[in-house]
Amino acid sequence: MDLQLTNKLALVSGSTKGIGLAIATGLAREGAKVIINGRTEKSVSTALAKIRQEIPKAILLGFEGDLSDAATAEKMAAQFPDVDILVNNLGIFEPKPFEEIPDADWRRFFEINVLSGVRLSRLYLPGMKKKNWGRIVFISSESGIQIPAEMIHYGMTKTAQLAISRGLAETCAGTGVTVNAVLPGPTRSDGVDEFVKQLSGGKPFAEFEKEFFKSVRPSSLIKRFATTEEVANLVVYVCSPLSSATNGAALRVDGGVVKTCF
């Protein structure tokens, strides 16, 4: 299937590893020009090399900077003013008991997970509306629906993304611009691998995975962590012109963890 993404310019925030890297790779494979973003020159150059090794003809650009910072977001928009596709992927997570989460952590999570996407959307949405085409995708989480007791501050940010995504879609009614949220479930990313190492006590990953889905996420229908590529496959489609009738949606790629049909 041709997703008609050739020469579309896509920005994926936080795209040097994990789900972001998989999304950037998927978009590049479909012919999009992709801006790779990370906080350091080394992380960006490593990601660029990795994608080029897999896709030699990929058209890639790099931007080093923390897009949770307002001034850096402005710099991004000045350097790349004509983005067609914006994937708000930048985010952090950290399990912590509610009683131990200080105000500073609440603000930090909101700044990175929520305001980064708000700012980039505010910068790029007017241009998309002007040319009557564009795609904005927020990478939320099933944790925005099923708030995890072990990281309530993270769940709060993911719920906020759902509200922002739907609200922005309402402002695009009657245009060729769509705004959607994609909700991954437990996904085996770099961050999750590190999280597993801390919790597993030296157990093999397969053993930990089996126990995790038995005791922590028993509602999962696939009984395993999704791959970053499985998440990216949905995101890349939502970014394409073929997804023109999908707007204002919260699309789950959660392995059936959320026990509802909608």
Predicted regions and their residues:
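Residue(s) in the substrate-gating loop at a strand-loop-helix junction
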Residues: S141
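Short C-terminal tail/terminal secondary-structure segment
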Residues: Q146, V236, L242, N247-F262
